[in-house]
Amino acid sequence: VLVAASGRLGSASVIVRRATPADIPEIVRLKALLMETGWPWPVAVSKDEDWRRRCAEAAEVLLARDTYACFVVDVDPLAGEGGSLVGCVSVAVEQHLPGPRGRGLSAYLSDMSTDVPHRGRGIGTALLDHAMAWAREQGAGRIELHSTESGRRVYERAGFEADGPFRHLGRQLV
């Protein structure tokens, strides 16, 4: 788990906007790209119609929530909603019982994906900056994420660092 308490804002050369339901097919495509090219084990979902349907349904539910935002970058900024995307990122804010500092609001960043030909052009950084700014505006005092080794550099440049004494544990429930 990597965490950050603050970050810088925006990149003037990349136009980031909040996703709408019209973007769902492209968000699903970018999620498949993320899993098929970025995960440390083989995943093949881009042609799995059942997965694509379930992912689109989940995206529709999430986009309707006030505590969730997905930010995107269009191939052609003039095309707007529903056009081809080159990148996206999701962020959700959750309320927890507060610790000794803060209000107990934290954010979790996920599904950062940039099309392969567009990587290294600041798109990931711009998406990350917008996601952190939105989480901060919602009152989150902390943001966390999980990263593969290949994605770690962009997060570390934004101030994320390996978490302290707590270790992330997980378990399948179904």
Model-based region annotation:
Residues 15-29, 40:
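A short beta-loop-alpha structural element at the N-terminal edge
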Residues 32-58:
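Conserved GNAT-fold acetyl-CoA-binding loop/helix
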Residues 57-72, 108:
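A short helix-loop-beta-strand connector motif used in the catalytic cores of GNAT acetyltransferases and
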Residues 72, 82-93, 108, 113:
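Conserved beta-strand in the GNAT
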Residues 95-109, 119:
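A conserved beta-turn-beta hairpin within the catalytic core of GNAT-like acetyltransferases
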Residues 109, 142-145:
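Conserved hydrophobic beta-strand within the GNAT/NAT acetyltransferase core sheet
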Residues 118-130:
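Conserved acetyl-CoA pyrophosphate-binding loop and the N-cap/start of the following alpha-helix
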Residues 125, 137-138, 149-171:
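Conserved active-site alpha-helix within GNAT-family acetyltransferase domains
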